[in-house]
């Protein structure tokens, strides 16, 4: 099974299955001298952890164990290996799935490709969103390293089912959405999302949603003009996330309905520099970052594992049958998916920042390490519940 790695200079390889002993990641290319602790990783993991309100009831603590690459809370320059053990596994929930592939899930394609006898049906195996724990671990390292360029990354849920954000949102509000149980950036929207989730849970159904992620102050000129355009790299990164169905940046698909005179973003003097009036391009022009905020959105489909009965094929007799999926599944995978999108954006930007020379390849100076730590502490403090930010 190839295709388990991402990145060129900052390269990650994820491993593990949903109901295996552990999931984990090997991160290659992190320069020596980066201040990094288990707490730094746990800070990001907490926002995708199951067992909380409105998400999967699977009670995982998601405690990261660092196996290599860090000594005295500093990276050594060697590969960083981190695992998270799977401690709340109930494989009996998947006994029926062994014979009845779930509609909307990867079950049947995996059987077709790898063979029924080789298919790990427990929790979806490698196709499970549990794999994204590894991405968030790596994303935490990438986010901290990006503090060297003062690039901050945060996301929120722009829509959930039929409900959507209808007003402008500040980056500070997006940061605060981390502590919203439904990743809403506005209090009234949070209440609407919560009502939808309760409804879906009662009906044994699920909802999809749109995640929006903003990267503030990315280095200028990241990406390449042809095949390695920043938009192409981000699209690949984000579309690799389970349940993601679509990707856009800036104006996105709305631009197809506009005139050139409307969609062209006027170039102006902006904060004593040359900039763009509205950032319609979402921070990317010609495949290169242009100094404006990088803004991307992606669509998550509704969680495919639902209690509502749906038609499938019983593989024991190849007759049509029905399946009602029991177990502990998210009523909206998009909620926890926001953190995963943030991580993939961070991994893409940090890899290109290293390619462009904006981040050292071998080691950080003491001044650089101190700057990173100070900015990281400020970032962590800035991520706080809406109520605290308004007080």
From Swiss-Prot:
Its cofactor is FMNH2. It is an enzyme of class 4 (lyase). FMN binds at residues 126-128, 286, 301-305, 328. NADP(+) binds at residue 48. Keywords: Amino-acid biosynthesis, Aromatic amino acid biosynthesis, FAD, Flavoprotein, FMN, Lyase, NADP. GO terms for biological process: amino acid biosynthetic process; aromatic amino acid family biosynthetic process; chorismate biosynthetic process. It comes from the Archaea. Its EC number is 4.2.3.5. It catalyses: 5-O-(1-carboxyvinyl)-3-phosphoshikimate = chorismate + phosphate. Pathway: Metabolic intermediate biosynthesis; chorismate biosynthesis; chorismate from D-erythrose 4-phosphate and phosphoenolpyruvate: step 7/7. Transmembrane segments: none annotated. It holds the Pfam family Chorismate_synt. One of its GO terms (cellular component) is cytosol. PROSITE patterns: CHORISMATE_SYNTHASE_1 (PS00787), CHORISMATE_SYNTHASE_2 (PS00788), CHORISMATE_SYNTHASE_3 (PS00789). GO terms for molecular function: chorismate synthase activity; FMN binding. Reduced FMN (FMNH(2)). NCBIfam families: aroC, PRK05382.1. Belongs to the chorismate synthase family. This reaction introduces a second double bond into the aromatic ring system. This is Chorismate synthase.
């Amino acid at each position: 099974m190839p295709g388990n790695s991402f990145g060129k200079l900052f390269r990650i390889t994820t491993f593990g299955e949903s109901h295996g002993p552990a999931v984990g990641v090997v991160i290659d290319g992190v320069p020596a001298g980066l201040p990094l602790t288990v707490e730094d990783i746990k800070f990001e993991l907490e926002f995708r952890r199951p067992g909380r309100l409105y998400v999967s009831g699977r009670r995982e603590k998601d405690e990261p164990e660092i196996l290599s690459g860090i000594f005295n809370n500093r990276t050594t320059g060697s590969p960083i290996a981190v695992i998270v053990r799977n401690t709340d596994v109930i494989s009996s929930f998947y006994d029926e799935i062994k014979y009845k592939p779930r509609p909307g899930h990867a079950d049947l394609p995996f059987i077709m490709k790898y063979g029924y006898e080789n298919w790990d049906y427990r929790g979806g195996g490698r196709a499970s969103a549990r794999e994204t724990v590894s991405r968030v671990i790596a994303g935490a390292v990438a986010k901290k390293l990006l503090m060297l360029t003062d690039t901050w990354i945060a996301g929120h849920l722009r829509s959930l089912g039929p409900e959507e954000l209808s007003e402008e949102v500040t980056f500070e509000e997006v940061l605060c959405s981390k502590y919203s149980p439904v990743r809403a950036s506005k209090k009234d929207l949070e209440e609407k999302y919560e009502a939808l989730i309760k409804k879906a849970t009662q009906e044994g159904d699920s909802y999809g949603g749109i995640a929006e992620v903003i990267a503030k102050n990315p280095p200028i000129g990241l990406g390449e003009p042809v095949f390695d355009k920043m938009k192409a790299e981000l699209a690949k990164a984000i579309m690799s996330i389970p349940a993601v169905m679509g990707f856009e940046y800036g104006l996105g698909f709305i631009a197809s309905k506009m005139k050139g005179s409307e969609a062209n973003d006027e170039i102006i003097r902006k904060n004593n520099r040359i900039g763009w009036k509205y950032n319609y391009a979402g921070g990317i022009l010609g495949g290169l970052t242009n100094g404006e905020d990088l803004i991307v959105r992606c669509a998550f489909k509704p969680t495919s594992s639902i209690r509502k009965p749906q038609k499938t094929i019983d593989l024991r007799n190849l007759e049509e049958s029905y399946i009602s999926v029991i177990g502990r599944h998210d009523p909206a995978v998009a909620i926890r998916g926001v953190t995963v999108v943030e991580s993939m954006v961070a991994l893409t930007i940090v890899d290109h920042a290293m390619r462009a020379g904006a981040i050292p390849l071998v080691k950080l100076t003491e001044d650089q390490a101190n700057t990173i730590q100070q900015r990281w502490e400020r970032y962590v403090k800035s991520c706080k519940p809406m109520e605290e930010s308004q007080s």
